Amino acid sequence: ESNPMLEISPRDLDADCFLLCTPEATYDLRKGMAGAREHSANDFITKITSVSPGIKGQQLWLDNLSLIFQKDQQLIDYVQMICGLAAIGKVYVEALIIAYGDGRNGKSTFWNAISHVLGLYSGNISADTLTVGCRRNIKPEMAEVKGKRLLIAAEMQEGARLNDSTVKQLCSTDEVFAEKKYKDPFSFKPCHTLVLYTNHLPRVSASDDGIWRRLIVIPFGAKIEGKTDIKNYSEYLYENA
């Protein structure tokens, strides 16, 4: 039951970046699995994941990682660290994570599965928003970024050049300026990890060191064919891993 006489500031909502709300419990990620506690309205959380933590299907997920990353355990550990950071509402990696490789290598399957698991904590942004070729007003799209912990852009056009200014704004801890349609402009502190999965590496300004240090390329070199190629595999992983 709501009480119109009680008001809170929007900045009080989802204010604790380490709290992760799941269907079964709210987790304080500083304490790991031991940080589980009952849901509380006093946490002012507005988002929730699609699933709760558990070990069911763990081996299926590990086998999938081994296939996609060709048994490169160092790479697997790094990618899992990135996914863990994406569950926290704080920018730890001021970079654009580029998942790169030819088709049929599992990159879209992997990131779509992670996005599905994170539920309302995850969002999408058009890949062309990150390029110099984007001529539209991107502030309404920026407005949808607020509060997301994982932000995914998919499939950049071949030969597209990154917009240094936009990438720097989305890959930093500085305030992001946005504007919903027919609403007043506002700013917010970003809390997301930004991932671009693509078959084509974007072009980058050769003279701007600031943009180069914000790019991390994760190779997806596997070729998944035959029996290992399952339609809608991201959904299968979501349901079973």
Residue ranges and their predicted role:
Residues 140-147, 179-198:
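AAA+/SF3 P-loop NTPase mechanochemical coupling elements
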Residues 15-18, 22-24, 190-205:
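Catalytic nucleotidyl-transfer cores of nucleotide-processing enzymes
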